[in-house]
């Protein structure tokens, strides 16, 4: 007789791939214009918010408006095309820096010239950075003084280094050398058609954490990232309801896809203000929430736990926060409850590794109730305009369902 433990193990019903076992979202599809370059998609609504804050420096309070961000990315794109950088379609640049306005400008400037950006943690080891540069084929690195000594020495000037903060021999300075090299009348990008743009070109090349081996480059195209942004913030009933009136906290590293996609790209798409923290600090984060009346706080479970256990929350007015997103790892209900006691006016949504609604059988991240019910042990409903298949790794066939 089988033991109780054995009886409780799920059994996959495996079939060869067929249309019947491709699961479509129960939510209606939305129109997605995913043939645009990523920068055009994210900046599409900028004329409506041109004079509003786009990037707010959490350390200094300095503000760049949407019009200024658009102008500066155009200017930097013009500089990337010129000597000595000479970048174009198919080139790869590396963003090796902590959160900053320069990170955003360099990312979208690369998109404008048809290049891809590989993002890297400046706290990585020299060996890890060298491997990523070699594997990705990056020829230009945007970085900061603290990380420049970690870069490999390439013969014949094969690697151009651009520093965003201090000056150093052998390196270009972001503002004084690169941006200043472009005359005021030459900061317009050419038409993508003339540059041979294709929506299936790679625009972002973040690296995995290496949980199944060495870190691997993840090739993300203009089409795939535009689609991802649309599935989060577009449509009449967006899954993550960011608006142009929101102020979004960016305390998570932009070199990670969560911050890069959900905070930076989605925030820019809707015209929200983004408060940029160079790196996370709990006390500083709460000060910024109070000072800038932050409404959206994308976090990760360790930060959620830190807030839940902190007495500092009582010393700050956090009432402006209406939505908290937690991603990268799941959380238990006890942690959620302890955290929400500190922010009773906010909605908490857990963002999963696959596109899905924030919490099953509960309000999603927009604060709306889902019209569909599902088990609490499930990961929720998947996004609109999305199809899902379950794969049995042992057979490489798709599973039609699970029997318990």
Provide a role label for each language-model segment.
Residues 226-247, 255-296, 310:
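Conserved AMP-binding/adenylation subdomain of ANL enzymes
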Residues 97-98, 115-133, 145-148, 272-292, ...:
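ATP-dependent adenylate-forming carboxylate-activation enzymes
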Residues 2-11, 105, 112-181:
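Structural core segment of the AMP-binding/adenylate-forming
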Residues 269-272, 294-299, 308-371, 380, ...:
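Gly/Ser/Thr-rich phosphate-binding loop
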Residues 83-88, 182-201, 205-250, 270-272:
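Conserved adenylate-forming
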């Amino acid at each position: 007789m089988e033991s109780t433990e054995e009886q409780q193990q799920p059994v996959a019903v495996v079939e060869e791939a067929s249309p019947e076992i491709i699961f479509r979202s129960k939510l209606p599809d939305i129109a997605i214009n995913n043939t645009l370059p990523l920068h055009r998609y994210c900046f599409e609504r900028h004329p409506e918010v041109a004079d509003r804050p786009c990037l707010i420096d959490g350390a200094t309070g300095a503000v760049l408006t949407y019009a200024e961000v658009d102008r500066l990315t155009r200017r930097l794109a013009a500089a990337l095309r010129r000597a000595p950088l000479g970048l174009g379609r198919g080139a790869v640049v590396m963003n090796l820096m902590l959160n900053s306005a320069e990170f955003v400008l360099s990312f979208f400037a690369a998109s404008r010239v048809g290049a891809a950006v590989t993002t890297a943690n400046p706290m990585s080891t020299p060996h890890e950075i060298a491997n990523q540069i070699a594997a990705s084929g990056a020829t230009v690195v945007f970085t900061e003084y603290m990380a420049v000594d970690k870069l490999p020495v390439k013969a014949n000037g094969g690697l151009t280094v651009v520093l965003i903060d201090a000056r150093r021999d052998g390196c270009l300075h972001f503002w004084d050398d690169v941006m200043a090299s472009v005359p005021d009348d030459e900061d317009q990008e050419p038409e993508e058609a003339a540059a041979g743009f294709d929506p299936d070109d790679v625009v972002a090349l973040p690296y995995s954490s290496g949980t199944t081996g060495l870190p691997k480059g993840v090739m993300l195209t203009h089409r795939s990232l535009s689609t991802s942004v649309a599935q989060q913030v577009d449509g009449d009933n967006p899954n993550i309801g960011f608006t142009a009136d929101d102020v979004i906290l960016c305390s998570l590293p932009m070199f990670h896809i969560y911050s890069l996609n959900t905070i930076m790209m989605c925030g820019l798409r809707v015209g929200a203000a983004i408060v940029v923290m160079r790196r996370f600090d709990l006390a500083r984060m709460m000060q910024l929430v109070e000072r800038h009346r932050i409404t959206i706080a994308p976090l990760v479970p360790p930060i959620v736990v830190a807030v839940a256990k902190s007495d500092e929350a009582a010393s700050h007015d956090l009432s402006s926060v209406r939505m908290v997103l937690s991603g990268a790892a799941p959380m238990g209900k006890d942690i959620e409850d302890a955290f929400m006691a500190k922010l009773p006016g906010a909605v908490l949504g857990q963002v999963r590794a696959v596109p899905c609604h924030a919490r099953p059988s509960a309000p999603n991240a927009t604060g709306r109730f889902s019209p569909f019910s599902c088990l609490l042990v499930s990961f929720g409903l998947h996004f609109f305009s999305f199809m899902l298949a379950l794969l049995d790794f042992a057979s490489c066939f798709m599973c039609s369902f699970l029997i318990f």
